[in-house]
Design a protein with these regions (language model features):
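Intrinsic-disorder/low-complexity detector
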Residues: 1-125
């Protein structure tokens, strides 16, 4: 199971966006902080109304990105912009429920982000 960065499927792209928001916000939490991210809190609403809920999640993510400092926030903002630009305009605005394909994309994107973070940390040592 690997991330398909070439997929333009609406459901796949929305899954990727949710994963980036989830990992970005979680990366600002202290290790002992076990509260759910906004992406996880709005998971069900997102699966049913992705366009509308993405607006809420993205606006909630903004303070966390600002807290990261330039390096971290730029990385996540680039990913969000790259993924968003892959949507057809009408598909992005389509607020109908997502298929389970978004779950696959979410898992693949989270896995890639954590794998990259682990590899980056090992290179620093």
């Amino acid at each position: 199971m690997s991330l398909d960065k070439e997929s333009h499927s609406r459901d796949y792209l929305y899954g990727r966006l949710l994963a980036v928001a989830d990992v970005a916000e979680a990366s600002t939490y202290a290790r002992e902080d076990s509260r759910p991210t906004n992406a996880k809190r709005f998971f069900e609403a997102f699966s049913n109304h992705p366009y509308q809920t993405w607006d809420v999640i993205y606006k909630s993510l903004r303070p966390y990105l600002d807290r990261m400092g330039r390096g971290g926030s730029v990385r996540y903002e680039r990913m969000i912009n790259e993924i968003t630009s892959m949507f057809e305009h009408d598909e992005f605005k389509n607020n109908s429920p997502l298929s389970p394909e978004f779950l696959h994309a979410y898992s693949c994107q989270v896995n890639e982000l954590y794998t990259k973070k682990t590899n980056d940390n090992q290179e620093e040592e």
